[in-house]
Amino acid sequence: MRALAAFRAAGGLGLNVTLPFKLQALAAADQASDDARLAGAANALRSEGERIEARNFDGIGLVRDIEVNLGLPLKGQRVLLLGAGGATRGALAPIARAGAARVVIANRTAGKAAALAQEMAPHLAGTVVEGGGF
C-alpha cells in the first residue's frame, strides 16, 4: 500500500484498481460502498479528506451495458452468470437491483456456485439466486 500512500501524497484523489489488487484495495479503505462490501473487492478508490472510500463498479457497468447499449431490460428476466468468482460477486447486487427475477450461477465446481448463491441470496431481495455446475 506504499504506492497508494505515495499517490495520495502527490495529490491523487482517485484511481481504478485491477486484478490482482481488488481485495487489497477494499482492505485499504476506511469506508466502502454496499456493492464493494458485498463483492468483497473494490475496483475504485477515492480520497475523501483523510479517508479513503472503496467502490465496485463491475456490476453497474455490466447492467448498463446490457440495458443501455444492448437495449435489453433486466426487469423480470432470468440471468445466467458463468463462473463463481469475483466478477460474479460484483455483478449480483446490481443485477438484482435492475429487477432480474432469477439469477443462475453456473460453475465447473457446482459446490462453489451453490455456496455463493446461498451466501448472496439474503442480500438480493426480490431475486431468486441459485447455483450449480456445468
Which sequence ranges carry the predicted segments?
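Phosphate/diphosphate ligand-binding glycine-rich loop within oxidoreductases
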Residues: 1-71
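Conserved residues at beta->alpha junctions
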Residues: 16-19, 83, 107
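Phosphate- and divalent-cation-binding pockets in alpha/beta enzyme and binding domains
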Residues: 24-25, 90, 115
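Short, well-ordered alpha-helices that flank and scaffold nucleotide-derived cofactor binding pockets
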Residues: 27-30, 64, 68, 93-97, ...
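Glycine-rich adenosine-cofactor-binding loop
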Residues: 54-59, 66, 70, 75-96, ...
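A structural signal for isolated positions on well-ordered beta-strands in alpha/beta enzyme cores
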Residues: 80, 103-104, 130
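NAD(P)-binding Rossmann-fold cofactor-contacting core
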Residues: 98-123
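Short acidic low-complexity segments
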Residues: 124-134
